Amino acid sequence: SASGGAGESSGMWFGPRL
């Protein structure tokens, strides 16, 4: 997801969990 996430396999964003 654009907001970030811990291991979003479907997205291209791998940021911190906000």
Swiss-Prot record:
Chain positions with Leucine amide modification: 18
Entries under InterPro entries matching the protein: Pyrokinin_CS
Gene Ontology MF term list: neuropeptide hormone activity
PROSITE patterns: PYROKININ (PS00539)
Alphabetical GO biological process terms: neuropeptide signaling pathway
Keyword Lyase: no
Record-stated family: Belongs to the pyrokinin family.
Protein name: Pyrokinin-5
